[in-house]
C-alpha cells in the first residue's frame, strides 16, 4: 500500500484532543508532508497546522486526504461523505484508519473510479497470518505497554527509534496501529487481525534479525482495559519482547471510555505485563517508564519522574519534555 504525500488532514468537528491523534501524529512526526488541516463548525481542537480548504490544498499539490479522527467503534459518519467526495473530485486519494471501510460506501467507490483515485483503508490488513508459534527469534525486541489506551505508546516508540538511530544503533520502528502505519509507511493494524492470529501477526512484524538489531514495537491498548486487553495480550506474546517500556498518563481516574473502572498503578501494570510476557520470553525486563506529564508543570513533572525512577529502579522520562536517551542508555 503506497500512501502519497502531501496530505490534507481532516479533523471534522472534533472536541476531544485524543480523538484526532491520527492527524496529530502526522502533524508532529511528518509535518513536512502536510499542507494543513481542515475542520468544520463545532471543532474545538487543532493539530497546530494552518487551516486549509480542499481547493486550497489541491492547489498546493495535496495528493491524499486523511481522515484524521477516531471515535468509539471506528464508525464513518455519513455526514462526512460530501466532504470526502469533494476531496476525491479534487484528485485526492482518501486514507482512513476507521473500522468502517471506505470501500463499503458505493458512492465513494464510484467517484474514486471516475477520478482515478484510491480509497485506502489502512486499518484492514490484506495479509493472511499464521497462528503464533512462540519459537525463539534472533535479534532484540522492545515493546511499549501502557496503563491505559492513549498514554503515549506510539510516541514513546518513535522517540526511542529516533534516539537510537542518532546513536547509530541498528533499529526499526514496527507500527501496529493506523497512526504508526501512516507515519512509517508499513505495519499491521493489529486490532483488526482475527483473534487467533494476533500473536502470529506480531511474530511476522518482527521476524528474525541480526543479533544486534532492535525492533521497537508499538504497543496497543492495555492489559488492564476490559475492551482491549485481548489485543494487548496477543501482541505481547507475539512480540516476544526482551525489553518493556511502561507508558503512563498522569491524573487519570478511570480507564479511557469506562467511567466505572478503576485505574491501575504502574506497579500492577509491570506485574501483569512481566507475567504475561514470560510465556514467550522468560528473560523479559522493564527498562524504562514513559510518562505524559503535560497535565502538570515542568517542575512537577520532573519531580514525579524522579520519584518513579527511584521507586522502580529504571529511567523515567516524559519523551516530549525530556527525550529518551536515558532509557536508550539503560537498554544498550
UniProtKB/Swiss-Prot annotation:
It catalyses: D-glutamate + acetyl-CoA = N-acetyl-D-glutamate + CoA + H(+); D-aspartate + acetyl-CoA = N-acetyl-D-aspartate + CoA + H(+); D-glutamine + acetyl-CoA = N-acetyl-D-glutamine + CoA + H(+). Gene3D superfamilies: NAD(P)-binding Rossmann-like Domain (3.40.50.720), P-loop containing nucleotide triphosphate hydrolases (3.40.50.300). Pathway: Amino-acid degradation. It comes from Pseudoalteromonas sp. It holds the Pfam family DUF1611_N. InterPro entries: DgcN-like, DgcN-like_C, DgcN-like_N, P-loop_NTPase. It is an enzyme of class 2 (transferase). N-acetyltransferase involved in a deamination-independent D-glutamate degradation pathway, named the DgcN-DgcA pathway. Catalyzes the transfer of the acetyl moiety from acetyl-CoA to D-glutamate to generate N-acetyl-D-glutamate. Can also acetylate D-aspartate and D-glutamine, with lower efficiency. Has low activity with D-asparagine. Cannot use succinyl-CoA. Disruption phenotype: The growth of the deletion mutant is significantly reduced with D-glutamate as the sole nitrogen source. Keywords: Transferase. Induction: Expression is up-regulated in the presence of D-glutamate. Transcriptionally regulated by DgcR. NCBIfam families: DgcN. Its EC number is 2.3.1.312. Belongs to the N-acetyltransferase DgcN family. This is D-glutamate N-acetyltransferase.
Amino acid at each position: 500500500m503506497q500512501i502519497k504525500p502531501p496530505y490534507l488532514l481532516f479533523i471534522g468537528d472534533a472536541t476531544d484532543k485524543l480523538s484526532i491523534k491520527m492527524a496529530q501524529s502526522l502533524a508532529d512526526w511528518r509535518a513536512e508532508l502536510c499542507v494543513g488541516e481542515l475542520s468544520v463548525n463545532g471543532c474545538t481542537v487543532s493539530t497546530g497546522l494552518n487551516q486549509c480548504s480542499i481547493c486550497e490544498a489541491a492547489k498546493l499539490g495535496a495528493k491524499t486526504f486523511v481522515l484524521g479522527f477516531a471515535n468509539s467503534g471506528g464508525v464513518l459518519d455519513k455526514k462526512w461523505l460530501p466532504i470526502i467526495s469533494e476531496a476525491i473530485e479534487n484528485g485526492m486519494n482518501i486514507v482512513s484508519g476507521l473500522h468502517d471501510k471506505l470501500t463499503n460506501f458505493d458512492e465513494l467507490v464510484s467517484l474514486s473510479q471516475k477520478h482515478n483515485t484510491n480509497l485506502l483503508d489502512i486499518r484492514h490488513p490484506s495479509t493472511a497470518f499464521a497462528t503464533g508459534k512462540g519459537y525463539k527469534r534472533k535479534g532484540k525486541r522492545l515493546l511499549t505497554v501502557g496503563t491505559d489506551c492513549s498514554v503515549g505508546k506510539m510516541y514513546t516508540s518513535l522517540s526511542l527509534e529516533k534516539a537510537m538511530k542518532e546513536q547509530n544503533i541498528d533499529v526499526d520502528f514496527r507500527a501496529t496501529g493506523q497512526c504508526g502505519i501512516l507515519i512509517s509507511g508499513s505495519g499491521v493494524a493489529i486490532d483488526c487481525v482475527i483473534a487467533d492470529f494476533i500473536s502470529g501477526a506480531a511474530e511476522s512484524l518482527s521476524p528474525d534479525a541480526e543479533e544486534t538489531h532492535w525492533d521497537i514495537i508499538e504497543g496497543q491498548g492495555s492489559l488492564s482495559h476490559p475492551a482491549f486487553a485481548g489485543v494487548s495480550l496477543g501482541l505481547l506474546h507475539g512480540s516476544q519482547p526482551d525489553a518493556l517500556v511502561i507508558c503512563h498518563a498522569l491524573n487519570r481516574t478511570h480507564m479511557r471510555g469506562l467511567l466505572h473502572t478503576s485505574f491501575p498503578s504502574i506497579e500492577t501494570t509491570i506485574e501483569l505485563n512481566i507475567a504475561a510476557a514470560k510465556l514467550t520470553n522468560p528473560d523479559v525486563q522493564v527498562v524504562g517508564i514513559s510518562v505524559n506529564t503535560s497535565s502538570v508543570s515542568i517542575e512537577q513533572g520532573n519531580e514525579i519522574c524522579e520519584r518513579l525512577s527511584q521507586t522502580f529502579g529504571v529511567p523515567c522520562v516524559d519523551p516530549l519534555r525530556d527525550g529518551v536517551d536515558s532509557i536508550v542508555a539503560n537498554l544498550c
